[in-house]
From Swiss-Prot:
Present with 846 molecules/cell in log phase SD medium. Its cofactor is Ni(2+); Co(2+); Zn(2+). Catalyzes the aldol cleavage of 4-hydroxy-4-methyl-2-oxoglutarate (HMG) into 2 molecules of pyruvate. Also contains a secondary oxaloacetate (OAA) decarboxylase activity due to the common pyruvate enolate transition state formed following C-C bond cleavage in the retro-aldol and decarboxylation reactions. GO terms for biological process: 3,4-dihydroxybenzoate catabolic process. It comes from Saccharomyces cerevisiae (strain ATCC 204508 / S288c). This is 4-hydroxy-4-methyl-2-oxoglutarate aldolase. CDD domains: RraA_family. A divalent metal cation binds at residue 123. Pfam families: RraA-like.
Length: 234
């Protein structure tokens, strides 16, 4: 079973718990304020980050065709240059949509597992008809060609979040998404086998905690009693 197949069994909450408790990542890898505009069907999505950077239309770098090079089992991740991002709602400084239905059509044909846009998207019904998972900050109707262009693929993306912290997404990072949102697993900083083992044990423990609570044991007591075993997996 591949890393992606192992991780797809878990919710983003499970993964965040692992990143927080095993690797002391305070955010649990979570990116706030993204909405599942075209939600995943029945399960989590997991894939390898294929990153795309957008810059102002007058940027000297030439535009790149990113959509015809989407790798299989990837999550397409689009973001703006940091100076076009905002800490505050709506989290970006342009009103145009960066991504549309034809892009999802092509990405799905190339066997991408989903798309994350740190900006606006359009053609909502098309994404949903395709059952192609798409997460974004919001929606719009206008194409982006008058204001921004894609200038780089497989580059680091810097994401300004609403707590004022800048998070990084690297090409090849694992991206997971479900109805709770989007989580990044930093591949270069984590032992995936160790992370998966912790998550599996944590899920087992929480099932026991749930049963204890249903049988009348106080929640705090059940958590303390059951979760002590997890220390050996950290």
């Amino acid at each position: 079973m591949s890393d992606l197949q192992k991780l797809q069994r878990f919710s983003t909450c499970d993964i965040s718990d692992g990143l927080l408790n095993v690797y002391n990542i305070p955010t649990g890898g979570y990116f706030p304020n993204l909405t599942a505009i075209s939600p995943p069907q029945n399960s989590s999505i997991v894939g390898t980050a294929y990153t795309v950077l957008f810059a102002p239309i007058d940027d000297p770098r030439p535009a790149v065709n990113y959509i015809d090079s989407v790798p299989p089992n990837s999550i397409l991740v689009l973001a703006l240059e940091p100076h076009l991002q905002s800490q505050f709602h709506p989290f970006i400084k342009i009103t145009q949509a960066m991504y549309g239905g034809l892009m999802s059509t092509r990405a799905q044909y190339l066997k991408s597992n989903g798309t994350v846009v740190f900006g606006r998207i359009r053609d909502v019904d098309e994404h949903r008809t395709l059952n192609h998972p798409v997460f974004a900050y919001g929606v719009g109707s206008c194409a982006p060609k008058a204001v921004v262009k894609a200038v780089g693929t497989n580059v680091q993306l810097k994401i300004l979040t609403s707590d004022g912290v800048t998070q990084t997404i690297c090409p090849g990072d694992y991206i997971a998404g479900d109805n709770n949102g989007i989580v990044r697993i930093p591949v270069q900083e984590t032992d995936i086998s160790k992370l998966v083992t912790y998550i599996e044990k944590s899920i087992e423990v929480d099932l026991l905690v749930s049963e204890d609570i249903k049988n009348g044991i106080p929640a705090k007591q059940a958590q303390n009693d059951r979760r002590s075993v997890l220390k050996k997996y950290i």
